[in-house]
């Protein structure tokens, strides 16, 4: 069959049709007739992705034949439009590739009794606009900031790559790229060419999934899998990788579910193939374990070979019998020297091969790293020893040989790297603990033919789909975010929110995936699964934060870029100074009595300088601390979006609090309703509730709730036929018809009821619209405001009707948190759109002197900028949509976790628990973190500043002690481990409690 050519077409596009008349004219079935026949259904469906195919149809003799072809093709699911030309023997079909394949079109025509084949070179390709994708890769072999800079530089130079961020501590890289220019395999190849290991983890594509397979052993198994997937409707593309037993599938989630794909694979293969979703976080953990195991294997191999070398050099010469054996000749060489040469060669070029490969690739790309230093030091020692051995073999004069130096350096470096891998693994414990919260399985309830749930099926929790009804047993984890549809229980949400008290759950209660059901059986309907769950978003947020770079990291990046060249230069200077001084007799020969000459004496100093220098400690100082801190913050309900936010928060001078929902509980309650006209109170409440019912503001909800209870309190919730009514149904009976509703931010709402204008809002709203407020109402309003209550004024047909008093209780911890901030040297500010009297009354209760009232949402950002003018660092704490401009404008935005998605998106911190204590925790944690980072930098710098001169022999004239190169290598290995361990001390962080918060002082 000819090669298929497809093209994407716009939803409403139609191919041109020839027209004419008479028997000679072409009989064309226009697409319009198909649209009419389908009642517009195809047109509506055409909004999705479409492709078109041109098919040659033979055997048609009349218009009845064209109708038969049209009918056969149209009957197939996924066909959008079809036009058949009798004279041209051609059919033009527009279809959804997710629901239908070209082979199905051919089959439909042939089943109708005609021959069909695809016409090549007739379809004009119209490629889709490719979106930018974000992919995550695990990158192995990075040891310092220079490695990170090297990988980032290579990635950013790739054609099609829009941006790249690489994190040393997590060994992860995130790449934003254009899939039409470059694919993930090419990105992996580029990273590997640079001397690092790379593996793809996950992509931002929502309709792509990676399945792991068991039972995929032979080519027959692969063919079976291909046949199964080809027959599935809804699959756009798949790629089977038999080597690693994985299949990557791009599918239409509206046409087919993930569970259906897995079931089809297992059923179609008669159970020979088992499919499971590859969890990228679990793969990351397994990669960590694999890296540690690989490093341990290299270390064991190196120890197995190096220990005999050490004994031959240090111990055996003192045992006469063994010494006599080692001094025996094997050709021109002593047996001991030959054994050391063989053993060390294996260590140098087999065990140490990774250093050579990494160093070569780094140099090839114009960068330098720790591997370059290790290779230089060990190679210099090895080459000298080989030359000395050969020189002694052919001249009879045997200079000292230092084979053990290169072997011991490699061994100690591997030991240090192994400890570093283990320590770095500890820094990601927070992510691992969050991943462990994800349940492995879920109990899916299945319906019978009558629609009743009669059967249970245990499935992989990753296969849960939106709308599934799941059974949650006591003591088991909630498998996905959802809503309780049956049952009551208490759920422990402390692992997500930090709240220790169990939360009661009943019908309509929201539940969070990963939380623990304590007692009672629940049936829940899943509404968010996979990457959309709260737990997945927290994991993603923490992981993103750990990948981000704090601005202070730029210092380490700069030092790393020049570190290795400087060290090599210092090593050469060290060699030349000692060698030239020895050449001219500037120091006595007794200093080099243990060596053959000043050349070897100087070379040992130079090698020690090369291998003792450690760029890794500098590179790990910031990312490991940030990684631990973000994990610790997540454990305490404080989610940090990046190292830059951590760095800014340590220097916060002002914390601005939004009033409603931040300082207050956000649970407004109507305390007073007073009418100042002849209107009945019930009618007044109905009027106000009708106007506010369309608003999402907390005060509006309080007003509607108050009116509902006023009218229905004590009345049985039943209708005339005795059936219980829902609250929504009863409320709809109460409310009046509203027209032209509009919410006025910072003022209130206005609408038309019975054709007359209704205003519900603050004093500004009614006075701006020319409504006169009587003196008695004004006095009543002032009394409300002086008692920290918000007054809501109501007018109907431009006449003042009445007002309502609303209070929003303060959070219990608000006053103590404000006092604690003052003790920390932070100035609290309250910002609100409420009137001045109410604002000042609330501020007085919590102890805030700086109040900004009657501020519109847009003006909140202006207040932030005004405080920033003198260079102050400003933090903003809020929860609503109207806070998002101020959150974005602030140096540090903190969104209350119960707030809106927009506010959370604009913030730098998310306070999951909706508790103001966490504002103090966020600032205190950032201060502790950067105190630790500064200590890490001090240690890393001090180590190199002190160690390099000592290795260069600065103390030798006074102590007569020369640092052996292998000992220098050990020092280098342990320096980076010590920095990681220093960062791990942040795991001991304990957040300030309300009982001790007042003891906090400015650091």
UniProtKB/Swiss-Prot annotation:
Description of the deletion phenotype: No visible phenotype under normal growth conditions, but mutant plants exhibit increased sensitivity to elevated levels of zinc, copper, lead, and to a lesser extent cadmium.
EC numbers for this chain: 7.2.2.-
GO BP of this protein: copper ion homeostasis; response to toxic substance
Origin: domain of life: Eukaryota
Membrane spanning stretches: 302-322, 331-351, 372-392, 396-416, 562-582, 599-619, 938-958, 966-986
Residues covered by the HMA domain: 51-117, 133-199, 207-273
Protein name: Cation-transporting ATPase HMA5
Organism: Oryza sativa subsp. japonica
Gene that encodes the chain: HMA9
């Amino acid at each position: 069959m000819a090669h298929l050519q497809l093209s994407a077409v716009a939803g409403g596009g139609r191919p041109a049709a020839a027209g004419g008349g008479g028997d000679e004219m072409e009989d064309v079935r226009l697409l319009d007739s198909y649209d009419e026949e389908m009642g517009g259904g195809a047109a509506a469906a055409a909004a999705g992705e479409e492709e078109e195919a041109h098919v040659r149809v033979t055997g048609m003799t009349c218009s009845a034949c064209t109708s038969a072809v049209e009918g056969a093709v149209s009957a197939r699911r996924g066909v959008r439009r079809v036009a058949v030309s009798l004279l041209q023997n051609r059919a033009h079909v527009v279809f959804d590739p997710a629901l239908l394949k070209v082979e199905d079109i051919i089959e439909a025509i042939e089943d109708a009794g005609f021959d069909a084949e695809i016409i090549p070179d007739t379809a004009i390709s119209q490629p889709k606009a490719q979106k930018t994708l974000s992919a995550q890769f695990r990158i192995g072999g990075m040891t310092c900031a220079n490695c990170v800079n090297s990988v980032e530089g290579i990635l950013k130079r790739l054609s099609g790559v829009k941006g790249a961020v690489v994190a040393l501590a997590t060994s992860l890289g995130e790449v934003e790229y254009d899939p039409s220019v470059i694919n993930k395999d090419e990105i992996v190849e580029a990273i590997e060419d640079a001397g690092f290991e790379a593996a793809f983890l996950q992509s931002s594509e929502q309709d792509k999934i990676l399945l792991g397979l068991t039972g995929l052993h032979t080519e027959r198994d692969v063919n079976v899998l291909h046949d199964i997937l080809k027959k599935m409707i809804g699959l756009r593309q798949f790629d089977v990788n038999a080597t690693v037993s994985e299949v990557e599938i791009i599918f239409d989630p509206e046409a087919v579910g993930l569970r259906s794909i897995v079931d089809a694979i297992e059923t179609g293969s008669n159970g020979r193939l088992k499919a499971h979703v590859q969890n990228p976080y679990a793969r990351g953990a397994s990669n960590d374990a694999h890296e540690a195991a690989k490093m341990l294997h290299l270390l064991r191999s190196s120890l197995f070979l190096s220990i005999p070398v050490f004994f031959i050099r240090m111990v055996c010469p003192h045992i006469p019998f063994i010494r006599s054996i080692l001094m025996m000749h094997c050709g021109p060489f002593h047996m001991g020297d030959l054994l050391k040469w063989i053993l060390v060669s294996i260590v140098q070029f087999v065990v140490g091969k990774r250093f050579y490969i990494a160093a070569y690739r780094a140099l090839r790309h114009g960068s330098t790293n720790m591997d370059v230093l290790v290779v230089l030091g060990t190679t210099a020692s090895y080459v000298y020893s080989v030359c000395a051995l050969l020189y002694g073999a052919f001249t009879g004069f045997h200079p000292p040989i230092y084979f053990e130096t290169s072997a011991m350096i490699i061994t100690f470096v591997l030991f240090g790297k192994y400890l570093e891998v283990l320590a770095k693994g500890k820094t990601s414990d927070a992510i691992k603990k969050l991943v462990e919260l994800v349940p492995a399985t879920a109990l899916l309830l299945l319906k019978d033919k009558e629609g009743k749930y009669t059967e249970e099926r245990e499935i992989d929790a990753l296969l849960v789909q939106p709308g599934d009804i799941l059974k949650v047993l006591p003591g088991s984890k909630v498998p996905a975010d959802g809503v309780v549809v049956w049952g009551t229980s208490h759920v422990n949400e402390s692992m997500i929110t930090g709240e220790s008290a169990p939360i009661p759950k009943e019908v309509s209660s929201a539940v969070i995936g990963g939380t623990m059901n304590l007692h009672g059986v629940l049936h829940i309907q899943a509404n968010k699964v996979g990457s959309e769950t709260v737990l997945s978003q927290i994991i993603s947020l923490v992981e993103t934060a750990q990948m981000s770079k704090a601005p202070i990291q730029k210092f380490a990046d700069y030092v790393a870029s020049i570190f290795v060249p400087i060290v090599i230069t210092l090593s050469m200077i060290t060699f030349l100074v000692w060698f030239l001084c020895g050449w001219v007799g500037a120091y006595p020969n007794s200093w080099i009595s243990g060596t053959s000459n000043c050349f070897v004496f100087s070379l040992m100093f130079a090698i020690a300088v090369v291998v003792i220098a450690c760029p890794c400690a500098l590179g790990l100082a910031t990312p490991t601390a940030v990684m631990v801190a973000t994990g610790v913050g997540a454990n305490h309900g404080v989610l940090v979006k990046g190292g830059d936010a951590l760095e800014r928060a340590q220097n916060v001078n002002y914390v601005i609090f939004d009033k409603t929902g931040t300082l207050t509980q956000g649970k407004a309650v109507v305390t007073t309703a007073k009418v100042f006209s002849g209107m009945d109170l019930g009618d007044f409440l109905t009027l106000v509730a009708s106007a506010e019912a369309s608003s999402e503001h907390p005060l509006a909800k309080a007003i509607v709730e108050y009116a509902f209870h006023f009218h229905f309190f004590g009345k049985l919730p039943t209708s005339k036929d005795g059936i219980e009514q829902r609250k929504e149904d009863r409320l709809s009976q109460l409310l009046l018809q509203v027209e032209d509703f509009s919410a006025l931010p910072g003022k209130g709402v206005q609408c038309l009821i019975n054709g007359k204008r209704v205003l519900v809002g603050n004093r500004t709203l009614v006075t701006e619209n020319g409504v006169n407020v009587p003196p008695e109402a004004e006095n009543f309003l002032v009394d409300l405001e002086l008692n920290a209550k918000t007054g809501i004024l109501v007018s109907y047909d431009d006449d003042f009707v009445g007002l309502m008093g609303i209070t929003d209780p303060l959070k219990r911890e608000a006053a103590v948190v404000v006092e604690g901030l003052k003790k920390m040297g932070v100035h609290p500010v309250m910002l609100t759109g409420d009137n001045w009297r109410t604002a000042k009354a609330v501020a007085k209760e919590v102890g805030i002197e700086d109040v900004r009232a009657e501020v519109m949402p847009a003006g909140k950002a202006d207040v932030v900028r005004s405080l920033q003018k003198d260079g102050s660092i400003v933090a903003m704490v809020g929860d609503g949509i109207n806070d998002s401009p101020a959150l974005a404008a602030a140096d540090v935005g903190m969104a209350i976790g119960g707030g809106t998605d927009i506010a959370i998106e604009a913030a730098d911190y998310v306070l999951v628990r909706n508790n103001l204590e966490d504002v103090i925790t966020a600032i205190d944690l950032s201060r502790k973190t950067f105190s630790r980072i500064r200590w890490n930098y001090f240690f890393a710098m001090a180590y190199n500043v002190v160690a390099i001169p000592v290795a260069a022999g600065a103390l030798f004239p006074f102590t007569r002690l020369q640092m052996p190169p292998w000992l220098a290598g050990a020092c280098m290995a342990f320096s980076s481990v010590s920095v990681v361990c220093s960062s791990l001390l942040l795991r001991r962080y304990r957040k300030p409690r309300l009982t001790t918060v007042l003891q906090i002082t400015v650091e």
